[in-house]
Amino acid sequence: MSRRSRSRASSAARITDEQIGDLVSKLQALLPEARLRSNDRVPSARVLQETCSYIRSLHREVDDLSERLAELLAAADVSTAQAAVIRGLLM
């Protein structure tokens, strides 16, 4: 690949500040607490930190619910076929 074509390829792959801002705004709209203050200008770093925290909390919630479901399965009178389907979903 020539130097000129590499330069064109790398510039085409670059994302603009406007695109980053748009993506951060969309990400902020997905955060439950951020929706309340969607009109406020929040720094991108803060949105990313809140997103990471939210994802971690969702992981914890999934783990807790999976554990709870496993306990219910162990205690419930569930047919073998139903239990196999539910266990398969948990994996």
From Swiss-Prot:
GO terms for biological process: regulation of DNA-templated transcription; regulation of growth. Gene3D superfamilies: Helix-loop-helix DNA-binding domain. The keyword Transcription applies. It comes from the Eukaryota. Residues 4-58 form the bHLH domain. Keywords: Growth regulation, Transcription, Transcription regulation. One of its GO terms (molecular function) is protein dimerization activity. Belongs to the bHLH protein family. Atypical and probable non DNA-binding bHLH transcription factor that integrates multiple signaling pathways to regulate cell elongation and plant development. PANTHER family: TRANSCRIPTION FACTOR ILI7, TRANSCRIPTION FACTOR PRE. This is Transcription factor ILI7. It comes from Oryza sativa subsp. japonica (Rice).
